[in-house]
Amino acid sequence: MGLSDGREVTTGSGLHGGCLCGNVRFRVEAVSRVHNCHCDMCRRTTGSAFAVLVWVASENLSWDSARPTYRRSSPIARRGFCKACGSPLSLAYDASPQETALRVGCFDEPGSLAPQYNYGSTQRLGWVCCGIDLPHRETKQQW
């Protein structure tokens, strides 16, 4: 798991994951950070109250089979999904091409990928209490 001070943590034999139908599979060698994102964009693209994002350096991510299909979700980011089953898989910001965020639910064994902080906390829905005790960081983006 990633550390809050920005250091990456290697995963030993790697973490594996993919989409619901198995068409898109990936392997992660090291995780940079994990956080809950409460921003409007993540809430809308997940169809849920918030997203849990696992950030990895691009060189630590390999696609084992088909790659995701991408679409622009905003002027600053694009999202990857499986074109066969529609599973949302990734998020990449134009300003940070060296890293990719993967959805925690796409990992085969996500239990060790606990969030370290909340992002976009001012946009958090009032009834969401999961991770409320974690540190909070803000975003200026509104969608």
Residue ranges of each PLM-predicted region?
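A short Gly-Trp-Pro
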Residues: M1-W143
